[in-house]
Amino acid sequence: MDLGDNELTLTPIPGKSGKAYMGSYPDGKRIFVKMNTSPILPGLAREQIAPQLLWSRRLADGRDMCAQEWLTGKILTPYDMNRKQIVNILTRLHRSRPLMTQLSRLGYAMETPVDLLQSWQETAPDALRKNHFISEVMADLRQTIPGFREDHATIVHGDVRHSNWIETDSGLIYLVDWD
């Protein structure tokens, strides 16, 4: 891959997206590199929700490449998910007006509760949609759905399972995988 930076070597990191790399410099310094990541990554790093963004550049083929600090630590386990730091990070994410403003400027549309129910109805597997219990729950949700207020809208990650959290050796925790 031509990065325009002869010193940086990229090694793929196994994962679902196929867009994550460990970048290595000749002096041994490592960085985390992701192709075509979320455009709100700089804001997430400013809010200390995601690791620090070091740089971003557009490649000749039009793809975007972002570099973040390399974190030494561990992926959280299901048992770790009840920690207060997790609650604090999610609270910061959900209450961040600057991130909401940034998403709005980037053209992201808000999804209302009605939108989410409709999306589920259209994309859920037939076996789930035809399940009697789930059908009753969906009917109840449709009847009791709350009103939507844009001023109360929040950002959500969408996949906060334990494997999307990293704890550094110094004890800091970050939410990752913003695809």
Language model feature labels by segment:
Residues 19-23, 142-179:
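Active-site acidic catalytic loop and adjacent metal/ATP-binding pocket
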Residues 1-11:
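Juxta-kinase regulatory segment immediately upstream of eukaryotic protein kinase catalytic domains
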Residues 3-5, 45-48, 150, 170:
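Short, well-ordered coil/turn elements that cap or connect secondary structure elements
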Residues 137-141:
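Short proline/glycine- and basic residue-enriched helix-capping loop/turn segments at helix->loop/beta transitions
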Residues 8, 51, 171-173:
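A structural micro-motif
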